[in-house]
Amino acid sequence: MPVTLEVSNHVAYVTLNRPEAMNSLDPESTADLTEIWARVRTDPDIRVAVLTGAGEKSFCTGTDMKKSPPPTECMAATYLRDGQPILPHMKMWKPIIAAINGYAVGGGLEIALACDLRIASTNAKFGLTEVKVASLAGLNGTQALPRAIPQAVAMKMLLTGEMISAEEALRYGLVSDVVEPSALADLARSYAEKIASAAPLSVQATKQAAVLGKDMPLEHGILYSHLLWGVLRDTEDRKEGFKAFGERRAPAFRGA
């Protein structure tokens, strides 16, 4: 299958499985990915997702231009009916971790930018190279990259199509960790299991406060956080958390 899904211990492991094509996205893999994100978003057993690419060379290099058919209708009809094919389906309050195991280029970097936590192997490369093929980083790249790293660096990448290394990505704050390729999967699993062991509603509310709050004035963001704290106050999981703390045991959260 061009995209695989494995669920273990409340973690969804999503793998782009076209290593022979640098894990680029053709119509079939795009459709698979859309279905998988719908499952991740709605399955109550899944609390966090890890996205990576198969093999050791590439996370994702965006659209497979060799397998992308020419458009059969005007842009307006396609956009107004379907919108974007992938990123809207990643919009959820469950966290998504990108384990970037090689090239994250074009749409591949844009997908990584839509994730909440990005970790990388030492051989990873990052770039939005669309200007080199007379295109534009239209999924989210022109907007998300300048918000993720310093403006000057983002503009250099966008306008020249130059790539940066994993070490540079770490220095600019595009990723939180860089490890040897052999250690990447274990690090992703460690972070995912830590998140999955926390109270699901608390994790989702925390993500919501952080994501929505950054577009609010500070005072409004703080007030919104207070509101979410109140929403969580009477949950069964919060009661369980306090009880487990008093009994010196691990809490058994249920997402209720």
Swiss-Prot record:
Homotrimer. Induction: Induced by toluene. Keywords: Lyase. Belongs to the enoyl-CoA hydratase/isomerase family. Involved in an anaerobic toluene degradation pathway. Catalyzes the hydration of (E)-2-benzylidenesuccinyl-CoA to the corresponding alcohol intermediate, 2-(alpha-hydroxybenzyl)succinyl-CoA. Also accepts the N-acetylcysteamine (NAC) thioester of (E)-benzylidenesuccinate. It comes from the Bacteria. This is (E)-benzylidenesuccinyl-CoA hydratase. Pfam families: ECH_1. It comes from Thauera aromatica. The gene is bbsH. Its EC number is 4.2.1.180.
